[in-house]
Amino acid sequence: MYKRQLLLGTAVGTLFTGANFTVDRLNLANGAGSGSATVISQWTTPWHGLEALGDMRNVALGLAVMFLAGMLACQYFMNNIADETLFARARRRMLTLAAPFLVFFLTFFVWLLFSDGLAVDAAGRISAEPYKYLHNMLEMPYVAAALLIGVVSVLWSIYSGWRGKRNAVWFGGAGTVLTVLALLLCAGWNNTAYYPSLAEMQSSLTIYNSSSSEFTLKVMSVVSLMIPFVAAYIWYAWRAMNRKPITREEIRGNDHMY
């Protein structure tokens, strides 16, 4: 049921643990006149990245994401289903999922703080740096603050759910967004290689060596101006769906209530 969340979390873990690939940008020049597609990156193992499943650090994050997804789903049911029996079941299930989520997330996070990372200097040279992600948190206090607020918010949602509060999902959802954002910023900001290469260190991806052309970035900047409109539509759609609590009769029926 949660296979996708497990694989997604495992894949995100490789932003910190790395993958076996190489990047050769000279292929852009060598293949310019060939008329065929130019490949500048390739896997160095026949597993094509699936070896990430063999790294328990990646799997720990994958399991954390899997249990978190289930926990948030239960909190959503608690907030939107007007049935005391289903509410009680969702509450019990949420508490069951919260315990392994905390174990696996803390396992990954403690490892992250004490692990080495790859730093990039002004010349673009990539080198290993002990405790890189811990340094990132200390040198970017706003990211650390976002992470702290996010984690506390998720913990509060668990406590609220345990107390039987229906609004636990709002704390859980907001805390999840802040926590994920902080981890992604920690992976790529502060001169950090956000996708380390285990095969060749200098092939690791950074914001500097993997950015698109100036034209593409300008187009993306213009497109990003539509984000507020997309966010407004999402808010409207969710408000329409959640305007009235879901009842047992609605679950059994085929009609839409929005």
Pin down the residues of each PLM region.
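Conserved small/polar residues in nucleotide/adenosyl-binding loops
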Residues: 1-5
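Long hydrophobic alpha-helical segments that form multi-pass transmembrane helix bundles
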Residues: 10-87
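Membrane-helix interface motif
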Residues: 12-40, 110-124, 187-200
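Juxtamembrane membrane-water interface segments of multi-pass membrane proteins
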Residues: 17-20, 73-93, 111-133, 152-173, ...
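Hydrophobic membrane-spanning alpha-helices of multi-pass integral membrane proteins
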Residues: 96-107, 143-154, 172-186
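Hard-cation-handling environments
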Residues: 99-106, 112, 116, 140-143, ...
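Short, membrane-exposed interhelical loops at transmembrane-helix boundaries
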Residues: 127-130, 196-216
